[in-house]
Structures are given as structure tokens and as C-alpha cells.
Amino acid sequence: FEVIEDVKNARSALGIIYFSRFNESVLSGVLAENHLLFTRLFTAAPHVFLSSGHPLAGKERVTLEELEEYPCLSYEQGEYNSFYFAEEILSTVKRRKQIRVSDRATLFNLLIGMNGYTICTGVISRELNGDSINSVPLSADEEIRIGYICRKGEPLGTLGERYLELMRRHIPQDDAIA
């Protein structure tokens, strides 16, 4: 929710969010109320990030059942913690072990140190993260539509355009919108 507020209040020129079957109608309404526009960048199937030493890291695909014994890591949602605004898809699935973190560095450290996992798009930058994190497809009947939001009728500006240009270098090109 904070990213929507930041863009609405012009603290940010753009923000990155995702739509899923679960959250699309709620988020679309919130964006319309706040005069914000969603532009899709790409669509992805759910993946999990695992440490390269995780027992499931070498599998071609994993299931939620296989992940059950490992801690699921997710981001704290701040003051507005409705599950419609969760940063991870499948956020309503009950998990035996759940750890909430506030930043990416902590999440990756716990992925490695505790054999945890997080559900994600599967997009990872090797130049930023090295080889310590693997992305493995998750067997789930879901899709994630990732895009950016901006204020309707306002240009992104030089910095916003440059950010999107750099971001597009790391997204799946077969599905990306140029």
C-alpha cells in the first residue's frame, strides 16, 4: 500500500506492483480512486527463491507441500497490512513456519542461513546477487502480472524513464512490453 501512497502523493514518480487473480479487482479500484495508471511490464509464473545449498534448489519445479517444512519468508506490510496488498503471491496460504522481514538483505540472509524460501516472480540479477540464490518454478495455478504505476496524465520524467530502461534489462524479454 505504501507504494500506492508514495506515487499518489508524488513522493515517487512510479512504483512497481503486481496483479494476481486474487488482488486485481481490489487493486484496480484503489488505483482508479487515486488516479493512478497500471502499465504491465511482464507476466510470470510463480517461482521460489532458494539458497543454492537448499535441498530443493536442484529441482526443476517444487510444490507447496515440498516447501512445508521450510520457513517461508515474506515482507512486513507496514500499517496497511491487508492481504490484498501483500508483496508475495499466495499470501493467504497457511504456512507452518512464517518469518516476516523488512528488507531484502535480511530476507536473502535468512534464505541462505535457514534454508528458507520466498515466493516471487523468478527474476533475479546475478550481477547483484551472485550465485547464492536460485530461482525454481513453483507448481501453482497462478500468474503474476508485474507492472508499474504512475499518476495519470503526468510524465515519468528522465529518472523514471531511465529506471524503467534499466529494469527492462532484467525482465523476461519474451513477455516484456518494450
Which ranges hold each PLM region?
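Alpha-helical segments flanking ligand/cofactor-binding loops in enzyme cores
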Residues: I4-E5, T39, E65, F108-N109, ...
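Hydrophobic hinge/microswitch elements
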Residues: E2, K8-A13, Y18, Q77-N134
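Secondary-structure junction motif
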Residues: S20, E24-S25, L56-A57, L64-V93, ...
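Short helix-loop capping/hinge motifs at secondary-structure junctions, enriched
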Residues: G53-V62, A140-E142, G153-L159
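Flexible hinge/capping segments at coil-to-helix
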Residues: V30-C72
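Beta-alpha-beta core module
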Residues: V26, A32-T39, A44-A45, A105-E154
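Extended ligand-binding regions for polar small-molecule ligands
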Residues: E65, R145, I149-A178
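N-terminal winged-helix
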Residues: F1-D6, P155-T158
